[in-house]
C-alpha cells in the first residue's frame, strides 16, 4: 500500500501526474506478457494495473474480453498469474502493482487466502470490479488484514453518500470512471469530472486516477486539468497488442512509443 503513497508524493514533488497502463496477465502468452510489462515500465509507466483472465468480464468491452480469451487460449491459470506477479515484483521492487479482478476469482479459494497470496507475491492493491462498495466488507477487511489496498470505482453519477463511503473505505487510489458503460477506447472519456474530484479531495479519498476511454495524450492532460492525480489506459494498449500478434517486436516498440507519449503528457 505504501508504494502508492510514495509514488504520489514523488510525482507531486515533480509536478507530474501518474500514467498507469492496464494489460491482462498472460496475453498473448506468459512469455510475451512479461516482455510487454518490461516495455511498459521502461517507457515510463508509474504503476501497473493488471487483469487476471476471467471467463465473463462484465465491466470490460470487446477489446479486453478478447485479451482474456487470448490468455485462456495460451493456457494461463490464476496460479500462473501469481507466479508472473512474483517475477514482476522481484524485478521491480518499487512500482505499485494493482489487480483488477472479478469476485468469482477472489472467492474460488477463499477470500482470505486470495489476499494472503496477493501479499506474498507483492501486489499492492485489488479492485474487485463486480462488487459494489455496499457489499465490499468481506473483501476490504481481508485486504486490509494483509496490507492490500482495496480500490473502489467512483462512477460519474456518484452521490454524496457513495463519495463518502469510497473516501472512507478506499486506500491506494480511487478509480474514477470517465463515463458509464464498459471499458474501451472506442468511446471517448467524458470530461470534466472536476466536481467529483473536488468532493473526493474534500472527503480525503485516496488520489483519483481516471480510467475508461483514455486513449490519447490530450485526454491525459484534460484528466490532470480536472484535478485527477493521473490516468489509466487499458483498451488503447490492448489494441496495440491485438494488432501486432504476429509481430512481437513491432508490438513492443509501438507500446513503448504509446506509453512514452502518454507519460510525457503528465508532465506540466
From Swiss-Prot:
List the PANTHER family: TRYPTOPHAN SYNTHASE ALPHA CHAIN, CHLOROPLASTIC, TRYPTOPHAN SYNTHASE, ALPHA CHAIN
Q: Which SUPFAM superfamilies match?
A: Ribulose-phoshate binding barrel
Cellular component GO terms, alphabetical: cytosol
| Domain of life of the source | Bacteria
What this protein catalyses is: (1S,2R)-1-C-(indol-3-yl)glycerol 3-phosphate + L-serine = D-glyceraldehyde 3-phosphate + L-tryptophan + H2O
Biological pathway = Amino-acid biosynthesis; L-tryptophan biosynthesis; L-tryptophan from chorismate: step 5/5
Q: What is its EC number?
A: 4.2.1.20
- Does Chaperone show up as a keyword for this record? no
The Swiss-Prot or TrEMBL record describes its family as follows: Belongs to the TrpA family.
Question: Which GO MF terms does the UniProt record name?
Answer: tryptophan synthase activity
Gene3D superfamilies hit by this protein: Aldolase class I
Q: List, from the UniProt record, the residues annotated as the active site of this protein.
A: 49, 60
Q: Which UniProt keyword terms apply here?
A: Amino-acid biosynthesis, Aromatic amino acid biosynthesis, Lyase, Tryptophan biosynthesis
* Subunit field text: Tetramer of two alpha and two beta chains.
Q: What does this protein do?
A: The alpha subunit is responsible for the aldol cleavage of indoleglycerol phosphate to indole and glyceraldehyde 3-phosphate.
Q: What is the lineage of its organism?
A: Bacteria, Pseudomonadati, Pseudomonadota, Gammaproteobacteria, Enterobacterales
Query: What organism is the protein native to?
Result: Pectobacterium carotovorum subsp. carotovorum (strain PC1)
**Name the record gives this protein:** Tryptophan synthase alpha chain
UniProt keyword Transmembrane, yes or no = no
